[in-house]
UniProtKB/Swiss-Prot annotation:
Name assigned to this protein: Ribonuclease M5
Binding-site list for Mg(2+) 2: 59, 61
Family: Belongs to the ribonuclease M5 family.
Subcellular location as annotated: Cytoplasm
GO molecular function per UniProt: metal ion binding; ribonuclease M5 activity; rRNA binding
Superkingdom assignment: Bacteria
Entries under SMART domains matching the protein: TOPRIM (SM00493)
Encoding gene per record: rnmV
Job of this protein: Required for correct processing of both the 5' and 3' ends of 5S rRNA precursor. Cleaves both sides of a double-stranded region yielding mature 5S rRNA in one step.
Top EC class for this record: hydrolase
Natural source organism: Mycoplasma capricolum subsp. capricolum (strain California kid / ATCC 27343 / NCTC 10154)
InterPro entries assigned: RNase_M5, RNase_M5_C, TOPRIM_dom, TOPRIM_RNase_M5-like
Keyword rRNA-binding: yes
């Protein structure tokens, strides 16, 4: 198993513990303490992102999306993201988080990192609408391809596709592969 050099941003202690159980105690994490993420923590994340890089790995729920968005908005440059889906969480668990995901789902997420750069503009809103990428059926296909939660809004998906520098042709190919 390859060593992770970046610092992983998680929501809480149980998430850190789960990742360290899988990857070893040398793994470095920063805990946001859920939605109570503060400016001091954001500054620390920014500093580490500029030095070693960070991976944002938040829970696949509303709070996790909000925390991810807060961090990305605060950073000046590219940032790595890992995603698990709610389907990756144990059906018997009352919580929906990284700590409740299977080891395989976590490894898959960290092996398939997605780079976000908020300075990218690869897709216009007009192109997004005119190509029907906003339709729920197409959004589900796109989300499944990138391992995003299927319930993200059309505006969020549009923003994320731009940050990833995904072109119209790339999206058409993703949808076309699913339909064939």
């Amino acid at each position: 198993m390859s060593k992770i050099k970046q610092i992983i941003i998680v929501e809480g202690k149980t998430d850190s513990d789960k990742l360290k159980r899988i990857y070893g105690n040398d793994l470095k994490t920063i805990q946001t303490k859920g939605l109570s993420i503060n400016k001091k923590t954001l500054e620390m994340i920014k500093e580490f992102n500029n030095k070693t890089g960070v991976i944002i790995f938040t829970d696949p729920d509303g709070a996790g999306k909000k925390i991810r968005q807060t961090i990305i908005d605060y950073l000046d440059n590219k940032v790595l993201n890992a995603f698990i889906k709610k389907d990756d969480i144990s059906k018997t668990s009352k919580k929906v988080g990284i700590a409740e995901a299977s080891d395989d789902a976590i490894k898959k997420a960290l092996d398939n990192l997605i780079i976000y750069d908020k300075n990218n503009v690869s897709l216009s809103w007009t192109d997004y609408i005119n190509n029907n990428f906003y339709l729920k059926s197409n959004r589900i296909v796109i989300c499944k391809y990138f391992n995003f939660d299927n319930n993200i809004s059309s505006k969020t998906l549009f923003k994320w596709l731009n940050w990833m520098n995904v072109s119209i042709d790339d999206i058409k190919k993703i949808i076309g592969e699913y339909e064939s």
